[in-house]
């Protein structure tokens, strides 16, 4: 359909932190490719979305609600921004609202918009982890979410099981960066050469560095004593670089600390193994084909609340994202009291040579292309198609029709 024949679409996109901002920018580019100039965009986001023409009414720094006990001082500002965002959506009255990740912020926006303007369709791009804890959220979302755009392949079945809103898998954003993760022939050869490159990935928050980096360093000392020389690369974010360098300066083998994303991905393509904090990075490592040991420690209060909720409410066999996608516990995980240098070293050492432990991970990671539908349409293109479909449906049927459909279900 040409721009002239296609009725203009009005969309409002909300992202509350940097990762969501990047997803929002990719979505906007895909929407522009599909709809050209027949598109009006509003939103709340960061620099990436601003570069695509979305002028946010305020900076999104500080909106991320992370941790269980560390945010009371920011709550008044956060709730003020929630009201401001919802009111801006209602004033724009778009054909669809797209909220991206950060559910503690974006879902409050969505609920307020549904109360104030119930005919605006709402899509949630990146599901909250209803499969990990508080699964009752899935059913509750039916009241204010019309479509979930999932980035993990097992999520649509989980929403169906939990009685949540319609959910469609569009693909993980890492799929669009797969070439950055995987080695060429020369880099693959470096993975087999000595000294082995080992990635150290202790997380991107101060608390993670504080709880993990010392234990990682002690584990590496044990591994080096038994394996011989290692080349260590520790990617981090700029605002933590000085803290990381100081903390790792006394290691038996000081790591090369890198903050440039290009250097990080170059190290991924050459690494033989990794020691990593639990999180999205475990899926990055799996897609890169790097055998990994994963660990996590947090404050005692957060551990009491989160780890028990995760295990008891959802009965998850693992908290490692790559394991959940694969459907088996391939990457060994060491959480809280189990996260000791001795255990980390014992799990990491076999990954440096041709052992059953290493082969099991490499073989499992080879199945990810099929599981995650890598090689087809880009995730941002799939997401843009669904967003456009929902928005155009509202345009064809009118807001009243959509409101009646939601009300009577």
Language-model features and meaning:
Residues 1-409:
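Nucleotide-activated sugar donor-binding and catalytic core shared by glycosyltransferases
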